[in-house]
């Protein structure tokens, strides 16, 4: 079992990565688990993993909230349902919230934990590749609003993250590849050596080779942990983790959080951002080609959907990086390096989006 520490002073926690961790969940934790627990999950996940988790939680007072499956249900309505369960059960501020599922479940559960009784303990058990390498680490919690993704939320760190790689065996091919997009992102923005490793091991990752997958997850978590430790509240460095997300979130919102997975939208967003960087002479053409080739090698989208420019603009204007009405873009400037840029003309952005969609 591998361990990655997220260093945040008294709020530090450990990410545990390995096989067969779920059946012995309580024994894996270095601290005593809360007596009152709400497990938030969804039907897709619960049919495989809820029973072994509940067996491990024997002796605790456990309630379960099975939210409906899908990004569109990461909503205030689902949040209210979870709150009703906690209040009706008489749970107090010593309770804990366990997220058993992917990014949607984790984001909602974290927001519930951050606000119930002004904050209760929160535990992450991510079951998708995307959530294991990204959303479960770093403390971002949120629900969506009809006008944009993640507009209502808080920074709230978990007490621990337990990544059981065996959970990936039940992922669909599409959801598995969605997680690969976030892994590619880390190489592009932060670690050229890791990017090269991904190029060299694309075949193994496509085949879900356990050794390659374990390393890719561990290195991704290490990178995110380093970034979060330096910039928890996204005042500078952490913003680079949003590579591809300004365009990606616009794709998701415009297609009503259903037609594209988050990872697919991010992959298309990475291409748009990389092309924008190339066109504005920040990224050389060779590096752009490497980024595109790696996404292609992992069977990820390299073109976004066609939609009116005004739709792109409307959704991008709701991005959290907008300041004083000015769009800010995370652009790769070399493999392993990126920067936040605001000095890009709308005409240039329009032309690049047209070319990439």
UniProtKB/Swiss-Prot annotation:
Pfam families named among the record's database cross-references: DHQ_synthase, DHQS_C
Transmembrane stretches, start-end: none
GO molecular function, a single term: metal ion binding
Pathway: Metabolic intermediate biosynthesis; chorismate biosynthesis; chorismate from D-erythrose 4-phosphate and phosphoenolpyruvate: step 2/7
Catalytic activities: 7-phospho-2-dehydro-3-deoxy-D-arabino-heptonate = 3-dehydroquinate + phosphate
This protein's UniProt keywords: Amino-acid biosynthesis, Aromatic amino acid biosynthesis, Cobalt, Cytoplasm, Lyase, Metal-binding, NAD, Nucleotide-binding, Zinc
NCBIfam families to which the protein is assigned, alphabetical: aroB (TIGR01357)
Full protein name: 3-dehydroquinate synthase
Organism: Idiomarina loihiensis (strain ATCC BAA-735 / DSM 15497 / L2-TR)
